Amino acid sequence: MKRVILHIDMDAFFAQVEQVKNPALRGKPIIVGGDAGHRGVVATCSYEARKYGIHSAMSSAEARRRCPHAIFVGGNLTNYVYISAQIQDIMNDYTPIVEPTSIDEAYLDITESYHLYGTPEKLAQDLKDNIKKRLQLTCTVGIAENKLLAKTASDMNKPDGLNTLWMNELEEKFFPMEIRKLRGVGPQTEKALKRLGINTLRDLKDYPEKKLSQNFGLHGEHLSKMAHGLSDTPVHSFEEMEDEKSMSHEHTLYEDTSDLIFLKSLMITLTDKVVARLKKAQFLAKTVRLKIRYSDFSTITREVTLNSMTDDVNTIYKTALTLLPVDDVVSNKVRLVGVGVTKLHEAVETPQIELFEESSISKKGKSGDVVEDIRDKFGKFSIVRASSLPYRWEH
Ligand SMILES: [Mg+2]
């Protein structure tokens, strides 16, 4: 059966919330986050400010240069989280399958419920009206048969938009798009694709998949599938994620970064912590999950299921590494990294090993591999004992 997925994206969320709270700010260029704290970057800005070329993650100094009369607002994360929860409540009135992907974005699977409203478009309009009526906030909704196209549809039509991207509209709306607009195509991939003469999604779709795979490995296959508008990732409801037995560790960076060495080292530390907990609880994991939050607060979670259950730090780290979207990480700075394991089962027998202690590295060849790999690639100072890393990085 054809699925119907919505992607809801609140328009300039933090700025809108501030404008609702203080009507004197309405219709004015508002910058949230800029002046507050040590970070000195724009968390988000109103559409009035965007007209001056200001965008999320820009330095406040640059934003002030572009629009000297912009109003800087410190922002109140607690309030945003509170309102985000209210939006989720409203979305839950339309379907139980709601997957929030950030504080102001979510996917909804309305396959089973849209007929109650007549059409998917009517359900989406009702949802938009409801959010507007109850919270005075506008959002943009994309409607399609899968998550990839729903997100693309909402990106096309901001703010206060409602846009469909059905399979029969791809010819007109999707295939003419430039390749860099496709999720997962960062500057590196874009350059490489252009070298092959691929400029639009149509070029990418028509390019032989075999040749793409030769150039990009597994990513090539994925790119080809996306260029055809295909994606079968299900919408995971929040409850479903909560119920699942899982263990994870996350770390919010002191400063956003695109430094791969740093991020990989951080992933080791996080894996180390996860594995320590796994072993302590005597569990084995079947699935490895990586979470990345970018400086604009957009968040991705990727996971892969292993062939067999494990509590081996080497296996879990290397698996997490295959999930790292290197292109995106380099082109968008990262704010938070999380490594986790799910699908846990009790282990029959788990030897207690302290990971990354000198003794275990020298005695246990396998644990040492990861360390040596990284040292080979990135130099001997790229990895030190896990427990000392946060100190080294954050001061
Ligand atoms: Mg938004």
Q: What is each model feature region?
A:
Residues 106-112, 301-304, 351-357:
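Short, hydrophobic beta-strand segments
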Residues 1-225, 238, 361-395:
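Gly/Gly-Pro- and Ser/Thr-rich, intrinsically disordered tail segments characteristic of DNA damage-repair
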Residues 7, 181, 191-333:
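DNA-contacting surface of Y-family translesion DNA polymerases
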Residues 13, 36-39, 295-298, 344-347:
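Short, charged/polar surface micro-motifs in flexible loops or helix N-caps
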Residues 145-148, 229, 284-294, 336-345, ...:
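A glycine-rich phosphate-binding loop feature that marks nucleotide/adenosyl-phosphate handling sites
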Residues 1-8, 100, 245, 340-350:
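Active-site-proximal helix-loop elements at catalytic-domain edges
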